[in-house]
Amino acid sequence: MWFKQISFYPLNKEKLPEADALADKLAEAEFTHCQGLDWFSEGFTAPVSFSPELVFPADFTLRVALKKEEKVLPAGVIRDILEEKVAEIQNNEARNVGRKEKQELKEQITDDLLPRAFTRSSRTEAVFNTRHGYLLVNNAASAKAENILTKLREALGGLEASLPNTKQSPSSLMTGWLLQGHCEGGFELDSDCELKGTGDIVPVVKVSKQDLTADEVVQHVKNGKTVTQLGLVWREQIAFILTQDFTLKRIQYLDVLQEEAESNGDDAAGLAFASQILMAESVSIMLEELVSYLGGWQD
């Protein structure tokens, strides 16, 4: 239930969907399995295993999940069958098979195999935090995060969400913190970072499980490199990697949060309820602190 990586979008708090209205809209875009000649199918599915509902509400949070099912049809399989058919025509009819005919044969083979192809599925989850006005997506890859945002907009007929565009760039803030050897407020340096230089061949330095205040690490910044990823700990509650794109990776929720969730959840539903609230609230407060150190939002 705890997101291990996060992309987030600030929302218009005055135009957030209610749980029932959101569920009704998502029901119109519910997931169905791939049919016949479909290469893939995508739609909303139950975000928790113990309930068939498409929205899992917990106080001021709403959890949703987008499922995608794709047909797996290896190109090598199609190529082998095509070669067999071409050879058969050449042998039986004593003629060559042209490019256009090969393409037609390839399409026929694909259409024949698709209904019987194996499938693979993936899912992306998101939580609406209506108190703070954020959509938290359980994926740091921009394509995946943008996809569920697009699907939500389509289902709802619109959703006012924006990219997290701050006055100061995350890279600039991270570089400054590493250079000065400490962070501001409730943040502390952890033990991982990535730095990049400039030029035609961009030099990349990755530091793992080291003291980030050490001279050999700080020297990279003094030599002109900028920090693109930085390991941070927030108020002894969350450890994570902040990226230059303002996404969070390798998130670890430390014992204090885990124990609080467990103390408030007696069964699967109760634990999911408590975990969702604690995760959404703590992450959102942490993000707001980061935004303040980044100079606030761009107008």
From Swiss-Prot:
InterPro entries in the record: RdgC
Chief localization: cytoplasm
Subcellular location: Cytoplasm, Nucleoid
GO BP: DNA recombination
Keyword vocabulary terms for this entry: Cytoplasm, DNA recombination
Keyword Ribosomal protein appears in the UniProt entry: no
Pfam families reported in the protein's UniProt record: RdgC (PF04381)
Gene Ontology CC terms: cytoplasm; nucleoid
Domain of life: Bacteria
Family: Belongs to the RdgC family.
Reported function: May be involved in recombination.
Protein name from the UniProt record: Recombination-associated protein RdgC
Organism, as annotated: Neisseria meningitidis serogroup C (strain 053442)
